[in-house]
Amino acid sequence: MKVIKTLSIINFFIFVTFNIKNESKYSNTFINNAYNMSIRRSMTESNPPTGASGSAGGSAGGSAGGSAGGSAGGSAGGSAGGSAGGSAGGSAGGSAGGSAGGSAGSGDGNGANPGADAERSPSTPATTTTTTTTNDAEASTSTSSENPNHNNAETNQANKETQNNSNVQQDSQTKSNVPPTQDADTKSPTAQPEQAENSAPTAEQTESPELQSAPENKGTGQHGHMHGSRNNHPQNTSDSQKECTDGNKENCGAATSLLNNSSNIASINKFVVLISATLVLSFAIFI
C-alpha cells in the first residue's frame, strides 16, 4: 500500500508539472497570435489610401504656390514702382511711371495697344512692373529725365523690340518641340523574334518533371530546365500561408489561431481529466 501511495503521489506531481508546462506554452502562443492579429488590424485601419493623400497634397501645394506667387509679384511691383517714381521727381516721375506701364503691358502680352499702356496714370505701374525685363527697366530709367512725348516714342520702340524677341523665343520653342524620329519603332519588329526565342525556354520549363530531368538536355538549356523543374514542384502551403501571400492581411494567421485555440481547448481538457483522475486515485488510496 505504501508503494502505491508513493507512486500515486509521484504520478500526480509529474502530471501536474507536465500539463502546466504544456498549458503555459499553448497559452503563450495564443496570446502572441491574438496580439499580432490586433496589431495587423490596427495597422490596416490606421493606414489611409495613398491616392487621397496625393491629391490633397497636390491641390494644397498648387493653391499655396499660386497665392504665394501672386502676393510676391504684387509686393515686388509696388515697391519697384514706388522707388522709381520717388527718385525721378514730380513731372519726371509721371513720365517714368508711364514708360514702366507701357513696358509692363508688352511683357504681359498686351502689346496690341501699347499707347494705352503708356498713357496710364503713374499709380498703375505698381501692379504691372513684375514681368518687365532688364532692357525695359534700363529704357524706362534712362528716359525718366526727358520729355514725356519722347518717352512715349521710345517706349513704343521698346515694346516692338520685346514683341520681336518674344516671337523669336516662340519660334525656337516650336523648333525644340519637334518629336524625335521613330527609329525604335522601326527596329521593334526585329526584336520580336528575339522575344519569341526568349519565350521558348519558358514554354519548355512548363513541361513535366520527367521530361525536364531527362539527360537529353545539353549545353546551357540543362541549367534552365533544372531551375524550371525546381520551381514547378507544388509547394505544401497551408491555407493561412496562401491567404498571407495573396495579400489578405486581415485573414492572415486566422487558420493558425483557430488551430491554436483547438489545441488549447484539448490541452485544458486533458489537464482537467488528469487532475481529476489523480485526485480520485489519491483520495481512494489515502482513505
From Swiss-Prot:
sequence-type repeats, residues: 55-58, 59-62, 63-66, 67-70, 71-74, 75-78, 79-82, 83-86, 87-90, 91-94, 95-98, 99-102
Localization of this protein: Cell membrane
- Disulfide bond annotation, renumbered to this chain: 244-252
In the record, biological process GO terms are: cell adhesion
Q: What is its main location?
A: membrane
Q: Where are the glycosylation sites?
A: 22, 36, 164, 236, 260-261
Region (Polymorphic region), start-end ranges: 44-213
Residues annotated as region Disordered?
A: 42-248
Kindly state which keywords UniProt assigns to this record, in alphabetical order.
Cell membrane, Disulfide bond, Glycoprotein, GPI-anchor, Lipoprotein, Malaria, Membrane, Merozoite, Repeat, Signal
Q: Where is this region: 12 X 4 AA tandem repeats of S-A-G-G?
A: 55-102
Renumbered to this chain, the positions carrying a covalent lipid of the kind GPI-anchor amidated asparagine are 261
Per the record, GO CC terms?
Answer: plasma membrane; side of membrane
**Which positions make up the signal peptide?**
1-20
Q: Fetch the InterPro entries from UniProt.
A: MSA2
What topology does the record note for this protein and the membrane?
Answer: Lipid-anchor; GPI-anchor
Q: Where is the composition biased (Polar residues)?
A: 150-180, 187-215
Residue ranges, compositional bias (Gly residues): 54-112
Record's compositionally biased regions (Low complexity): 121-149
Q: Which residues are the propeptide, according to the record?
A: 262-287
Fill in the domain comment.
The N-terminal region appears to be involved in lipid binding.
Job of this protein: May play a role in the merozoite attachment to the erythrocyte.
Name-wise, this protein is Merozoite surface protein 2
